[in-house]
């Protein structure tokens, strides 16, 4: 396995930002600031801890650091005496409150950091960049927009931006990624510094250029990207703006320096310092009692859960550490090292391991409990094979893992193979094949001696994400057989809403160890696993195998408690894994020349649309700029602002807003079409040729089996599930998908499968009869809604829209918008539909109630989707029967209302996913006797490439197999088409 775990999360907290928000949130409230009966201020302590608890609960970080400002001046104050000179004097009660907060954080053993001469932002910036380089996913909790400049998808850094009152909502923050920053600021994260350099920042007394405001700064950066390029192109800028820029260059450069966060502060901390290692209850509880924060005393077990690296709660009075807190890190001062009693530690690994790299030699400090055997001689391999032959009990399968130098199985070299067959320290082995140093066995010897174990089904195996290992081994001439358990898929079936990487599974099942991610190895950009010494790679791979072996028994035991889920895993998901591996290997041909022509056509169309939009607006502007577009729509054209929402830089122009504005002005249709075509061009037409494999001349999409909570497959590299089909251009993209030369491309598509499933689940008489009699169900609906037998194509289309829309909870307004009728007419149609299909709506409501009462709903075959509601009134209804529930007086938040809509739809969508997966498993057996190969699965459609001579015989067999995949109360119908490309086969 090239990368065995998701990156651990490093949470960085802007201490003063959160503390001040807590202080003013309560200080400005009607009840005033919080105080104890003795008069001690506690607004900061209460608000800070409450918010931090919520973030820890939702984000579950592996490490945390909290940065604070110091009182003395920083290098920015020395460079500019006016810097932050407008800040008010810190209130006395805030300082006192903050001192108690520091004590609480020390009692919780959380690392607080300051550094002389630098601000908290610089500490956060340094830790964020260093954390990213060390393999962490980084999230920064702050209400300071300055930190937006650190956001980076490449570095895996985002900001949890505090809301105006972070103590009045469920989470108190909005997570902003790259696009989130653009939406909020109108510029990219990389442009934040130059944005402030141009227009300044009054809150920090950063001057910027006199006469240049935010709008002008955004416009300049949209056109020239950076401050440096603005000045490089100064000759092209005319009038007063050029004069302001010319006169203000020194101010701009000075402001740029003030605004830029330092990312190389020499902090005296290690990653070990930032791990969540537990805390002393004896120290924390008296402090909480003194501050009269009794609500937190009642939640002491939650504190242990959130601040102890997900370790089991420690009983009060029997602590897991020595009671000594981590000290606040300050510049130029030594820090006392805390070494908790090893015998009391509940985890072998807490977070990221220590990685040493000196003179090119990389080693990892791993526990002595794992002692992998490094197999480098034929005699050692023969002895290992003899040992492995003893393990034929499927209840105790041998765990396997591969190590490669690439994530792409088509090009990856097999660097090593690992296995674990017991819980003893030395019942782990690593077989190196292609490291750059050390004695190793050849691939030929491995195939001769180990091949009989790997390929023979009598030797049961367990793997984490077996599809990857299967493909890697296959490309090296080694068959993988006898996989009785895939831990990733088992976790997915049991808990589809959770993550399923090895690190998270180790934590969730309390293995007492945490698998390492590839980034934990400390390899440089040009290095791979092959650069590791054999012992180091053996430790890394061995830990993966050992963890997988331990997980197997725990997952099998849990599966035994849920027979229907076990059957889904054994009969659907695990057989499908092998099928998907073959589909990924096969790939599909792409017509690159055609896509180049289509790209040129799209470019011309986009230019035409832009010209039309400029004419409608009366001026040219950047259609891709939310800020500029908002100005045109709501300021110049005067469109209804109530249909949008206020953002930091103006009004939202997202897709939902534009849909609401459709019909209000012709420019809206132009903008929507422009966005659709631009996305098609960038995401598919221009991107697909770049993904063609040089050796196979095909694209090899990845089918993701353990991602969606509904049970559906997803795909990536490229994402073929999202190719739209409504527009002419989107349909033309499918023309680029080709079969093997002189073969046919065949499409087998389930017709109206979700409506048929709805008919089966709801037992709605109208739908049952319509499908049973092979009638046009959309026509039937239209006839019932309009009260007449003869309907027009437009009326049938209205019936189709409402039939499919009701599955996804479509309301009257959206129905009216999509069909072009008035809101009043839309409401009348929806009401009429409710009366006509009463049993459908009874069923949908029952599913919502089941989700509340049981916490989950199920598909036809028993797949579960779980729902965790936030609204307390809903949570209190858990455990009751459906007939006992009454939601009339229940007030719920927007997210829970959305969850209920998903609960109504989940059995339908999930059953659809189950049916096509069952069909794929059955078809794979059918196709063993033919040359035809399954290539793609997209929604309810399967794509094959087929020799023309097999069409007459095989097409009916494929159709029948799919239609008989699962027996419903109504017939399943599959439509078969063939052609020389995908578009022709639709």
From Swiss-Prot:
One of its GO terms (biological process) is DNA-templated DNA replication. Residues 308-327 are annotated as: Disordered. InterPro entries: 3'-5'_exonuclease_dom, 5-3_exonucl_a-hlix_arch_N, 5-3_exonuclease, 5-3_exonuclease_C_sf, DNA-dir_DNA_pol_A_palm_dom, DNA/RNA_pol_sf, DNA_polI_H3TH, DNA_polymerase_1. Coiled coil: none annotated. SMART domains: 35EXOc, 53EXOc, HhH2, POLAc. Signal peptide: none annotated. Transmembrane segments: none annotated. Residues 1-303 form the 5'-3' exonuclease domain. Keywords: DNA damage, DNA repair, DNA replication, DNA-binding, DNA-directed DNA polymerase, Exonuclease, Hydrolase, Nuclease, Nucleotidyltransferase, Transferase. Residues 304-592 form the 3'-5' exonuclease domain. The keyword Transcription regulation does not apply. It comes from the Bacteria. GO terms for molecular function: 3'-5' exonuclease activity; 5'-3' exonuclease activity; DNA binding; DNA-directed DNA polymerase activity. The keyword Transferase applies. Its EC number is 2.7.7.7. Residues 593-986 are annotated as: Polymerase. Belongs to the DNA polymerase type-A family. In addition to polymerase activity, this DNA polymerase exhibits 3'-5' and 5'-3' exonuclease activity. Single-chain monomer with multiple functions. This is DNA polymerase I. It comes from Synechocystis sp. (strain ATCC 27184 / PCC 6803 / Kazusa).
């Amino acid at each position: 396995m090239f990368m065995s775990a998701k990156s651990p999360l490093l949470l960085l907290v802007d201490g003063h930002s959160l503390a001040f928000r807590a202080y003013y949130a309560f200080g400005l409230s009607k009840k005033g600031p919080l105080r104890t009966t003795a008069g001690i201020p506690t607004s900061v302590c209460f608000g800070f801890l409450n918010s931090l608890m919520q973030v820890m609960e939702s984000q579950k970080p592996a490490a945390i650091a909290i940065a604070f400002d110091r009182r003395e001046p920083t290098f920015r104050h020395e460079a500019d005496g006016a810097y932050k000179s407008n800040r008010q004097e810190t209130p006395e009660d805030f300082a006192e409150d903050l001192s108690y907060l520091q004590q609480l954080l020390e009692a919780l053993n959380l690392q607080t950091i300051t550094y002389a001469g630098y601000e908290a932002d610089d500490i956060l910036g340094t830790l964020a960049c260093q954390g990213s380089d060390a393999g962490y996913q980084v999230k920064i909790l702050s209400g300071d927009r300055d930190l937006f400049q650190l956001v980076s998808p490449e570095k895996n850094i985002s900001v949890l931006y505090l809301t105006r009152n972070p103590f009045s909502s469920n989470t108190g923050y909005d997570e902003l990624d790259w696009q989130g920053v653009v939406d909020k600021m109108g510029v990219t994260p990389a442009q934040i510094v130059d944005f402030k350099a141009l227009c300044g920042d009054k809150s920090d007394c950063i001057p910027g250029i006199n006469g240049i405001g935010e709008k002008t700064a955004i416009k300049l950066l949209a056109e020239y990207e950076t401050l440096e390029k603005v000045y490089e192109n100064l000759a092209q800028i005319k009038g007063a703006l050029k004069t302001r820029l010319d006169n203000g260059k020194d101010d701009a450069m000075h402001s740029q320096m003030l605004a830029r966060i330092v990312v190389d502060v020499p902090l005296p901390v290690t990653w070990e310092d930032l791990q969540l290692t537990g805390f002393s209850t004896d120290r924390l509880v008296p402090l909480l009692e003194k501050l009269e924060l009794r609500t937190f005393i009642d939640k002491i077990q939650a504190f242990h859960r959130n601040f102890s690296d997900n370790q089991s709660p420690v009983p009060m009075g029997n602590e897991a550490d020595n009671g000594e807190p981590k000290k606040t890190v300050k510049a130029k001062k030594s820090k006392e090292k805390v070494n908790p009693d090893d015998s009391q530690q509940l985890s072998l690994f807490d977070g990221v391991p220590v990685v040493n790299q000196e003179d090119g030699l990389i080693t990892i400090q791993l526990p002595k409990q794992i002692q992998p055997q490094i197999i480098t001689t034929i005699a050692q391999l023969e002895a290992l094979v003899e040992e492995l032959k003893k393990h034929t009990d499927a209840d105790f399968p041998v765990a396997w893992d591969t190590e490669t130098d690439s994530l792409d199985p088509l090009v990856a070299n097999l660097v090593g193979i690992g296995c674990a067959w017991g819980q003893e320290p030395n019942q782990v082995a690593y077989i190196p094949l292609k490291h750059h140093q050390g004695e190793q066995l050849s691939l030929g010897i491995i195939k001769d001696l180990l091949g009989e174990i790997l390929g023979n089904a009598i030797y049961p195996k367990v793997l984490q994400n077996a599809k990857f290992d299967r493909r890697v081994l296959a490309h090296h001439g080694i068959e993988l057989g006898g996989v009785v358990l895939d831990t990733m898929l088992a976790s997915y079936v049991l808990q589809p809403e959770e993550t399923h990487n090895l690190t998270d599974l180790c934590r969730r099942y309390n293995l007492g160890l945490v698998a390492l991610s590839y980034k934990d190895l400390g390899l440089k950009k040009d290095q791979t696993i092959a650069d590791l010494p054999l012992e180091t790679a053996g430790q890394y791979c061995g830990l993966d195998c050992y963890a997988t072996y331990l997980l197997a028994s725990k997952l099998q035991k849990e599966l035994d408690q849920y027979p229907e889920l076990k059957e889904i895993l054994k009969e659907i998901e695990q057989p499908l894994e092998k099928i998907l591996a073959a589909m990924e290997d096969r790939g599909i041909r792409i017509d690159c020349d055609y896509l180049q022509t289509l790209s040129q056509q799209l470019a011309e169309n986009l230019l035409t649309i832009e010209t039309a939009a400029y004419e409608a607006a009366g001026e040219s502007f950047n259609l891709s700029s939310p800020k500029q577009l908002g100005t045109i729509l709501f300021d110049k054209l005067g469109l209804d602002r109530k249909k949008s929402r206020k953002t930091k830089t103006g009004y939202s122009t997202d897709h939902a807003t534009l849909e609401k504005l459709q019909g209000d002005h012709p420019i809206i249709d132009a903008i929507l079409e422009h966005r659709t075509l631009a996305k098609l061009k960038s995401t598919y037409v221009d991107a697909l040729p770049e993904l063609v494999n040089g050796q196979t001349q095909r694209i090899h999409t990845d089918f993701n089996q353990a991602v969606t909570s509904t049970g559906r497959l997803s795909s990536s590299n490229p994402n073929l599930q999202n190719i739209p089909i409504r527009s002419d251009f989107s349909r033309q993209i499918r023309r680029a998908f080709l079969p093997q030369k002189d073969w046919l491309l065949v499409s087998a598509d389930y017709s109206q499968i979700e409506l048929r499933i709805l008919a089966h689940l709801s037992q709605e008489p109208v739908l049952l009869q319509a499908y049973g009699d092979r009638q046009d169900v959309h026509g039937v609906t239209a006839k019932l809604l309009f009260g007449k037998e003869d309907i027009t194509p437009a009326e049938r289309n209205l019936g189709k829209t409402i039939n499919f829309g009701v599955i996804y909870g479509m309301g009257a307004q959206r129905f009216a918008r999509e069909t072009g009728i008035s809101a009043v007419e839309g409401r009348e149609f929806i009401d009429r539909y409710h009366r006509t299909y009463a049993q459908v709506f009874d069923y949908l409501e029952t599913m919502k109630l089941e989700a509340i009462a049981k916490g989950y709903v199920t598909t036809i075959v028993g797949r579960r989707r779980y729902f965790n509601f936030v609204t307390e009134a809903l949570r209190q209804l858990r455990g009751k029967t459906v007939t006992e529930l009454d939601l009339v007086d229940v007030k719920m938040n927007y997210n829970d209302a959305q969850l209920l809509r998903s609960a109504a739809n989940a059995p339908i969508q999930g059953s659809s996913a189950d049916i096509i997966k069952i069909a794929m498993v059955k078809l794979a057996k059918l196709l063993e006797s033919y040359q035809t190969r399954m290539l793609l699965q997209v929604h309810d459609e399967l794509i094959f490439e087929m020799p023309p001579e097999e069409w007459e015989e095989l097409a009916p067999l494929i159709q029948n197999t799919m239609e008989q995949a699962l027996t419903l109360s109504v017939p399943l119908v599959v439509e078969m088409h063939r052609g020389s490309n995908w578009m022709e086969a639709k």
